[in-house]
Amino acid sequence: MIPKIIHFCWLSGDKYPELVQKCISSWKKTMPDFQIICWTTENFDINSNTFVREAVACKKWAFASDYIRLYALYHYGGIYIDSDVFVFKSFEPFLANRAFSSVEYCISSNCYTCNIEAAILGSEK
């Protein structure tokens, strides 16, 4: 079972922009009994992984978070959500699964695609 933990990354140390504040508020509103862990350079040892260290040194926050999100899910389990994702409905129904990922559909007159996304991922520890 997936634990009630929401993970997200904020590595720049900057104040959250208004969009990110609204997104985090949406998580708290839709999943009030979930623990929220914000991964930063203070609580993740960026020197523990060469890729993360180099990404942070170049201020490539999204690259570093690609590793950290998987680290968090592997070691703690829970749900990783990108900081710019607004949630309208609880993910509680997904907790009975061992893992899940998000998908993005693109439907237009000349193409139809379905991409697996890493913006929202969930897994057991």
Model-found features: residue ranges?
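Generic recognition of cysteine residues
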Residues: 9, 23, 38, 58, ...
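Short, low-complexity, polar/charged sequence segments that are solvent-exposed and flexible
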Residues: 25-29, 55-58, 120-122
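N-terminal anchoring/stem segment of glycosyltransferases
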Residues: 1-49, 125
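Aromatic-acidic/polar surface patches that form glycan- and anion
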Residues: 13-20, 58-66
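GT-A fold catalytic core of metal-dependent nucleotide-sugar glycosyltransferases
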Residues: 62-116, 120
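An acidic/histidine-cluster motif and surrounding catalytic segment
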Residues: 31, 38, 46-63, 94
